[in-house]
Amino acid sequence: MDPQYARLVKAAALSATVLASILLIIKIFAWWHTGSVSLLAALVDSLVDLAASLTNLFVVRYSLQPADEEHTFGHGKAESLAALAQSMFISGSALFLFLTGFQHLASPEPLQDPGLGIWVTLIALFSTLILVTFQRWVVRKTQSQAIRADMLHYQSDVMMNGAILIALALSWYGFHRADALFALGIGAYILYSALRMGYEAVQALLDRALPDDERQEIINIVTSWPGVIGAHDLRTRQSGPTRFIQLHLEMEDMLPLMEAHILADQVERALLHRFPGADILIHQDPTAVVPKERHAHWEL
């Protein structure tokens, strides 16, 4: 396990947990004083944020454990489970927002002290922007699915806080249904984000292949290597930070076993240089045993 990967994902998960805890306390105070349904929506979302970020923190720590006798491929899929759990948390909060929004749309109430709500929302907006910027940088460095899911979650929070600001301002000027309307819009966006996040997590758990551009890079590296006649049966997947790459190399029929082994090792090192930490399995085939329709065949 790359020490930098472990350090970055732990820092990102811990930062999200701390921020969610602070914002939850602030929003409870603000909602109590204003009665805003949009702030209630933000409060519920912060509660879900905290639960999701705590889950993320513990799961990320577990996923970083090295492979053992019972989990020979490591614990990386725990990240996908964390993302799936987050999608469920977020879906639940979206449904709550729909119910509350419809209730207040039918019976709108004037807000108490909307100025306080605006200040609290501004604090939440800028602090969440800082967190999302940090998380995006971590995802760019690590490709962590759990942190990417958390980042998508907090990106929806940024949108939500912006919408709440508009709703509070409109309510201040007498348009009291704006609060409920924006709560419904926020709920719809959060539900969409949750469904997208859940889909990505399920695809990872089902061992979806690596993206087309990465598989094309693998093909380019292998087929351009001196001594490699062709290749077939490329299989790829990703579990946590680890990419798994399997393929068959086609070589000269009479190539000595030691030379075939050395050639396969060279290809493996070239792939590891491009995809550090990857788990690579290469099978060597003499061209005579490969059916004609499979020569130099790759499934993309």
Curated annotation (Swiss-Prot):
Q: Write down the SUPFAM superfamilies for this protein, in alphabetical order.
A: Cation efflux protein cytoplasmic domain-like, Cation efflux protein transmembrane domain-like
Q: Which residues bind Zn(2+)?
A: D45, D49, H153, D157
Q: How does it sit in the membrane?
A: Multi-pass membrane protein
Membrane-spanning parts: 12-32, 40-60, 82-102, 114-134, 164-184
Which key words tag this protein in UniProt?
A: Cell inner membrane, Cell membrane, Ion transport, Iron, Iron transport, Membrane, Metal-binding, Transmembrane, Transmembrane helix, Transport, Zinc, Zinc transport
| InterPro entries hit by this protein | Cation_efflux, Cation_efflux_CTD, Cation_efflux_CTD_sf, Cation_efflux_FieF, Cation_efflux_TMD_sf, CDF_Transporter
Q: What GO molecular-function term can you cite, just one?
A: zinc efflux antiporter activity
Question: Any idea where this protein resides?
Answer: Cell inner membrane
**Got a GO cellular component term for this one?**
plasma membrane
Please, one GO biological process term?
intracellular zinc ion homeostasis
The reaction(s) annotated as catalysed by this protein in its Swiss-Prot or TrEMBL entry are: Zn(2+)(in) + H(+)(out) = Zn(2+)(out) + H(+)(in); Cd(2+)(in) + H(+)(out) = Cd(2+)(out) + H(+)(in); Fe(2+)(in) + H(+)(out) = Fe(2+)(out) + H(+)(in)
Q: Which HAMAP family has this protein been placed in? A: Cation_efflux_FieF (MF_01425)
Q: What does this protein do?
A: Divalent metal cation transporter which exports Zn(2+), Cd(2+) and possibly Fe(2+). May be involved in zinc and iron detoxification by efflux.
Task: Give the family, as the similarity comment puts it.
Answer: Belongs to the cation diffusion facilitator (CDF) transporter (TC 2.A.4) family. FieF subfamily.
Q: Summarize the subunit comment.
A: Homodimer.
**What's this protein's name?**
Cation-efflux pump FieF
Recorded source organism is Yersinia enterocolitica serotype O:8 / biotype 1B (strain NCTC 13174 / 8081)
**What gene name is listed for this protein?**
fieF
